[in-house]
Regions:
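Catalytic-histidine neighborhood of serine endopeptidases
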Residues: 75-127
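A conserved glycine-rich beta-strand in the N-terminal activation segment of trypsin-fold
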Residues: 53-83, 116-120, 217, 240-242, ...
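Active-site substrate-binding loop(s) of clan PA
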Residues: 38, 68-70, 90-96, 120-125, ...
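C-terminal cap/linker of serine protease catalytic domains
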Residues: 24-27, 36-39, 93, 97-106, ...
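A short, Trp-centered hydrophobic/proline-enriched beta-strand micro-motif
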Residues: 41-58, 66, 161
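Catalytic nucleophile loop of clan PA
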Residues: 68, 210-231
């Protein structure tokens, strides 16, 4: 069987569609500065994300992490930002095995109340590239607030930063995690450096702000609640083979 080829015109059209989508989301919604809230209040923009790939035989593979809302201040939100690797299975497997494997992404406002929405992946960049995904909710909601962005060039080593999210090691010690705003954890530290991680194309802030599995995709905010980065990874100590105290967040300019 001859493989179906995509013409150069089709490729250009698809590329322009993606560029147009990103510009539409962030040109209108990705507002810089003006957070006007403390880091604790920024929890009101954070969500828990559950991603799964499955087939009709009951087999599945799941991932989870954190996301956060973007939009115009004071208006309902419809877009969520997270890491690409948080939703990778739900996006990539259906692409590789159409009509055999299906994907689902759920955005939770409160798992305890079974309050969630099915989201559509409208932009996806894999872990080896930008490692960013944009999710679109079925309709605008007031259950979360939009977080403002801070230009990356204004962030300097020594700046205070706070990581928000749902780290698995913290949730595992709770008898009944709710995955709501009250379950969002906060860790504090400083920006150490700006670098590029091996095997990726994005720039990241190196930091001593503690993050763990489950924090992926969550916002790294400043003392005014502005998002400086997207929490993404922790370095391994090559001597011990254990996780180190060196952590990374994708700079927010990679999003805009």
């Amino acid at each position: 069987m001859e493989a179906k080829k995509t013409s150069s015109k089709q490729v250009v059209a698809i590329l322009l569609l993606v560029i147009g989508l990103i510009a539409g989301v962030f040109g209108i919604l990705g507002l810089v500065g003006g957070g006007g809230m403390d880091p604790y209040e920024a929890r009101n923009g954070v969500v828990y994300i559950y991603s799964v790939a499955y087939n009709d035989q009951g087999q599945s593979e799941a991932g989870w992490g954190t996301g956060w809302a973007i939009g115009k201040p004071g208006e309902p939100v419809q877009y969520i930002v997270t890491n690409g690797h948080v939703v990778a299975d739900a996006y990539e497997y259906p692409q590789q095995y159409p009509n055999e494997i299906f994907g689902s992404v759920e955005v939770y406002y409160s798992a305890a109340e079974n309050d969630f929405a099915q989201a559509e992946i409208v932009y996806y960049s894999p872990q080896t590239q930008k490692d960013i995904a944009i999710l679109r909710l079925p309709s605008p909601t007031e259950k979360r607030i939009a977080l403002s962005l801070r230009e990356s060039d204004s962030v300097k080593p020594g700046d205070t930063a706070y990581a928000l999210g749902y780290p698995g090691n913290a949730v595992a010690n709770q008898p009944l995690p709710k995955y709501d705003m009250n379950d969002v954890t906060m860790t504090k530290g400083i920006i150490s450096n700006r670098t590029t991680l091996t095997g990726t194309t994005y720039e990241a802030f190196q930091m001593d702000v503690s993050i763990a599995g489950g924090n992926s995709g969550g916002p790294l905010v400043d003392e005014s609640g502005n998002v400086m980065g997207i929490n993404v990874a922790t370095a391994y100590d090559q001597t011990t083979g254990q996780l180190s105290d060196v952590h990374y967040a994708i700079i927010i300019d990679e999003l805009t």
